[in-house]
């Protein structure tokens, strides 16, 4: 099998690359490890895209300029990302939504609500599944070949340049030759053995929010072949999910957004982090690592009646009780310790106008750890509780790329091997996360990689 461009992966970044290469008139094959009904990688579960814009649009409110976007990114990652790639990502994010719409992707009208995202993020109508269906429909119309249940088991590289790949599909092995290739196969979060190398036994208690097919095979092939690594094996997008979620592929409905509205305690009934440190889209992805550091990698969110209706609930019902003590017992927590924690928290709360849309003045004083915003006493029945575990979305260890999205092999950018999406996200994300930026990385670098591969295949 011979093509101009081979794209490995089947999510947003991969399809953006495939469509961009096809736009340039190249023959393209997409090698998707998942079966057809599971196609799309983690993009199946996405909801929105973060993008800079200078004025309100049909799908975004207000303005979100490049400098503010960059400031937000630096705030969550400590300014450790590749500065040139970060700036380019933000500048090119302006083009993403119109380009997606050309391929049948539809967006919701601008939304307002508790997620603080109406100004910064455009939401997909129908979510990630509709997004990926639109892309695959466009790929079919344009004559892009797609191999499902197909895993790249080896790459034939010559001095850092791509020549061919051996792909296992349907119990057979095929060799795909291509003049250029794009690797967009995600991270290794579904590979529990690899996670244990970084996290130890704690990884056994992680829940994988997305696809079970991101086991890092192509990433390992590239690193073993001399690709320059970027990022840390422990760095990842990880949030707090309902502990009752399935081990794989639970998606957005297992996420818990109630943490800023209450308190979070560990198995000993003790608080361990500031639940109100920052607005939720800039803070939610820190909670997975925080919970992972607790005994048994488990925690519990406690809220009272004042919070009910203010957050998107888990797909699983809350534990409900008429008192804090009874709630602690229902959650198998030490009731005296939980009661003392709640009493200390309530005594430390300083009243102010409550506003979940801003960094309000509702805070604690003299409490460690503090709650910096949205602190209200837990004093109104019924009381709700949710068990939490770390929910990993994707890992940040990946391959280094240049500004053309070429993989840096043995210190030199490859002439025809590109990477996009989570497999190279560590160039931009070293720590933390901004809601929707994963889709931005996939779209911007997917398009860039596809166009670059098309040029290399001339």
Regions found by a protein language model. Name each.
Residues 1-13, 29:
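Beta1/beta-strand and adjacent pyrophosphate-binding region of the FAD-binding site
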Residues 1-5, 23, 432:
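Extreme N-terminal leader/targeting segments of oxidoreductases
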Residues 27, 33-145, 151, 262-271, ...:
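Conserved N-terminal/central alpha/beta ligand/cofactor-binding core
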Residues 172, 176-242, 439, 448:
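Glycine-rich loop(s) and the adjacent beta-strand/alpha-helix scaffold that form part
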Residues 219-221, 225-339:
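An anion/pyrophosphate-binding glycine-rich loop and adjacent beta-alpha core
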Residues 337, 341-431:
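A glycine-rich dinucleotide-binding beta-alpha-beta segment and adjacent secondary-structure elements
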């Amino acid at each position: 099998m011979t093509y101009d461009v081979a794209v490995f992966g089947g999510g947003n970044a991969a399809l953006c690359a495939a469509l961009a290469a096809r736009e340039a008139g190249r023959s393209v094959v997409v090698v998707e490890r998942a079966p057809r009904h599971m196609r799309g990688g983690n993009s199946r579960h996405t909801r929105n895209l973060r993008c800079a814009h200078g004025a309100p649009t049909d799908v975004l409110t207000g303005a979100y300029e490049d400098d503010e976007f960059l400031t937000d990114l630096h705030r969550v990652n400590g300014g450790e990302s590749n500065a040139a790639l970060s700036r380019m990502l933000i500048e090119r994010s302006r083009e993403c939504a119109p380009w997606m719409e050309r391929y049948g992707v539809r967006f919701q009208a601008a939304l307002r609500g508790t997620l603080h995202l109406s100004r910064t993020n455009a939401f997909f109508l129908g979510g990630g599944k509709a997004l990926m269906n639109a892309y695959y429909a466009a790929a079919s119309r344009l004559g892009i070949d797609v191999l499902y249940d197909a895993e790249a088991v080896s790459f034939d590289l010559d001095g850092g340049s791509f020549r061919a790949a051996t792909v296992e599909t349907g119990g057979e092995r095929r060799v795909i030759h291509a003049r250029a290739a794009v690797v967009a196969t995600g991270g290794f979060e579904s590979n529990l053995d690899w996670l244990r190398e970084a996290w130890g036994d704690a990884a056994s208690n992680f829940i994988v929010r997305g696809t079970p097919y991101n086991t890092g095979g192509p990433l390992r092939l590239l690193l073993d072949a001399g690709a320059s690594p970027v990022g840390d094996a422990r760095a990842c997008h990880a949030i707090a999910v309902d502990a009752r979620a399935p081990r794989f592929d639970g998606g957005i409905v297992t996420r818990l957004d109630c943490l800023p509205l209450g308190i979070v305690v560990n198995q000993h009934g003790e608080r361990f982090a500031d639940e109100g440190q920052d607005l939720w889209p800039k803070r939610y992805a820190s909670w997975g690592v925080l919970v992972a550091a607790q005994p048994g990698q488990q925690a519990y969110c406690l809220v009272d009646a004042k919070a009910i209706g203010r957050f998107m609930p888990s797909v699983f019902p809350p534990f409900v009780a008429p008192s804090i003590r009874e709630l602690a017992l229902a959650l198998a927590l030490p009731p005296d310790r939980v009661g003392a924690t709640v009493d200390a928290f309530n005594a430390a709360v300083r009243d102010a106008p409550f506003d979940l849309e801003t960094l309000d003045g509702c805070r604690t004083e003299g409490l460690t750890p503090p709650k910096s915003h949205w602190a209200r006493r837990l004093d109104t029945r019924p009381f709700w509780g949710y068990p939490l575990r770390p929910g990993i979305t994707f890992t940040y260890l990946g391959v280094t790329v240049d500004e053309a999205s070429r993989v840096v092999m043995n210190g030199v950018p490859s002439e025809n091997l590109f990477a996009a999406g989570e497999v190279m996200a560590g160039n931009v994300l070293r720590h933390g996360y901004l809601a929707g930026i994963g889709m931005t990385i996939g779209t911007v670098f997917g398009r860039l990689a596809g166009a670059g591969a098309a040029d290399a295949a001339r």
